[in-house]
Regions:
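Short glycine/proline- and acidic residue-enriched helix-loop micro-motifs
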Residues: 96-116
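Phosphate-coordination/substrate-recognition cap region in phosphate-metabolizing enzymes
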Residues: 36-95
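Generic beta-sheet signal
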Residues: 5, 133-142
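A polyampholytic, Gly/Pro-enriched intrinsically disordered region
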Residues: 87-101, 178-188
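Glycine-rich phosphate-binding loop signature in dinucleotide/nucleotide-binding domains
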Residues: 42-44, 128-133
């Protein structure tokens, strides 16, 4: 049985614009409008899941979707870095930031290691391998990156290679035994 999975990164927040590690913050006004514009493309889902954060709940609302919330789709826990800018962390904790970026099994901020995010997301993907139908998952850039590297069987160290923007849409399909990335083209 074929399963289609559509990943949607939440809309833009102040943290996105200001290059900060996010808190549980709302979408900005422009993000709500942009999200509503893509809603017609996502109305035909058999199952909808979302991270329980405010920004993903607001994205789901703007899309007109009613998700089941899953902690497995939550953003990385950035520990004491939450709410702080990357520039600030670079200035105050350059060694810790470098370690976190280079060694995915480390969490010098006291939160969650990138490797732990990848393990969590891989388990969620595995549970839906044979689900069938169309699944929509509204989540965060870190979760979508983890899903991509899991699908490609890439090492966790490649986590930073994918750049996921707000409202990015990533498609995957499963034939029941493995996930594949799916790139859509324009239809004639």
């Amino acid at each position: 049985m074929m399963t289609r999975l559509t990943w949607i990164c939440h809309g833009s927040t102040a943290a996105n614009r200001e290059a900060r590690f996010p808190l549980d913050e709302p979408l900005n006004e422009k993000a709500v409008i942009a999200t509503q514009a893509i809603a017609p493309r996502l109305r035909h889902a058999d199952n909808v899941f979302a991270s329980p954060t405010l920004r993903t709940r607001q994205t789901a609302d703007a899309l007109g979707l009613q998700p089941a919330f899953s902690d497995a789709l939550a953003d990385c826990d950035f520990g004491r870095w939450a709410g702080r800018s990357i520039a600030e962390i670079q200035q105050l904790e350059p060694e810790n930031l470098a370690a976190w970026m280079a060694r995915p099994e480390e969490a010098p901020h006291g939160g969650e290691a990138i490797a732990a995010v990848c393990t969590r997301v891989n388990a969620w993907l595995s549970q839906r391998l044979q689900a069938g139908g169309h699944i929509v998952a509204i989540t965060h850039a870190a979760v979508i990156r983890a899903a991509i590297i899991s699908t490609l069987n890439a090492p966790v160290a490649s986590f930073w290679i994918a750049d996921i923007e707000p409202l990015a849409i990533v498609h995957m399909t499963s034939n029941g035994s493995r996930w594949s990335l799916r790139v859509e083209g324009a239809t004639a």
